Design a protein with these regions (language model features):
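Active-site catalytic microenvironments for nucleophilic, acid-base chemistry
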Residues: 140, 158, 174, 194-201
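Short, acidic/small-residue loops that bind anionic groups at enzyme active sites
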Residues: 146-156
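Acidic two-metal-ion nuclease catalytic site recognized across multiple nuclease folds
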Residues: 1-30, 197-286
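Acidic, divalent-metal-coordinating active-site segment for phosphoryl/phosphodiester hydrolysis
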Residues: 186-195
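Conserved non-catalytic scaffold segment of RNase H-like nuclease domains
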Residues: 2-148, 161, 165-181
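Short, solvent-exposed loop/turn segments at secondary-structure junctions
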Residues: 131-133, 155, 225
């Protein structure tokens, strides 16, 4: 991967700048129109990676209006951030990653009414690794289960854009800026800047997300797959459902037939015996 061409200066040097979000307009004025989308960018910091049991310790959401043709940011419509006291000790290793200590969250509580107001206004919710953030939000806020979630890791083809990693920090550096990562609002602002970055002359990444939010996704379940095929399934990007004991992956409609043939040849001994089912737009990343 090379940095975007605008960064390269004489003597093969790269110029990076620190981004703190101040260049994003903080207008609380609705400039949306029939040709724009209201998008909620969301980020969480948590006590750990266990989606079913760990707790949120910081949340940031920002509602923005985006032009559906250009991907330009029309306005910041609303925003909210807060710590949340998990009422349990934050592990020191977690604090080393996000810088959040027990003292910082002590006594704080998220105003879920404020979060709900923002999410309810949004046409779609974007998170970097949406499957992680959504799992927590679905536990805490019922309206999360009704919204369309889209993932800036999986729903932007970063590789075709010339980037060999989808990690947010790396993508931002390759676009010429760095930021105070692993703090919720800093991550949100940096993601907005990345998705609407002016270096994208043809199609900004945020437009990929808007487009993919309306494209149906299909789940292929390799039920009753032989145990000895687990490694080849894993190497072909299948995930293991530990509760129901089967391998699965999500695909677009144009990928289904070739995947069925692959499963027939490599897993089922010549005949496809899996299950294909359409995922509703609001169930994506559940």
């Amino acid at each position: 991967m090379t940095f975007i061409k605008e960064l390269i200066v004489p003597e093969n040097k790269i110029e990076l700048r620190k981004f703190d979000g101040n260049t994003l307009s903080n207008q609380i004025v609705d400039q949306s129109n029939a040709n724009s989308s209201k998008i909620c960018i969301l980020d969480l910091e948590t006590t750990g990676l266990e989606k079913a049991n760990d707790k949120i310790i910081e949340l940031a959401v920002k509602l923005m209006s985006v032009d559906n043709k250009t991907g330009d940011l029309n306005a910041i419509l609303n925003q909210y951030e807060s710590f949340q006291d998990p009422e349990e000790h934050i592990d020191e290793k977690v604090s080393m990653v996000n810088g959040i200590t027990n003292d910082m969250v002590d006594g704080h509580a998220i105003n879920w009414d404020s979060v709900e107001e923002i999410m309810e206004s949004a046409d779609l919710i974007i998170a970097h690794n949406a499957g992680f953030d959504r799992a927590f939000m679905d536990r805490y806020l019922p309206i999360s289960k009704e919204k369309i979630w889209i993932c800036s890791v999986n729903d932007v083809d970063w590789l075709s854009r010339g980037f060999t990693s989808s990690k947010q920090e790396l993508l931002c550096i390759w676009h010429g800026f760095y930021y105070d990562s692993h703090r919720a609002m800093s991550d949100v602002d940096a993601l907005i800047n990345l998705l609407a970055h002016p270096s994208n002359e043809t199609k900004k990444p945020v437009l990929d997300l808007i487009e993919n939010a309306s494209i149906p996704t299909y789940k292929v379940s390799a039920i009753n797959s032989p145990y000895e095929t687990k490694d080849i399934l894993k190497s072909n990007s299948y995930f293991w459902n530990g509760d129901q004991k089967y391998w699965w992956k999500n695909l677009l409609i144009g990928e289904i037939e070739s995947e069925k043939r692959w499963l027939a040849d490599n897993v089922y001994g010549g005949h496809f015996m899996g299950i294909v089912e359409e995922i509703s737009l609001t169930d994506k990343y559940k």
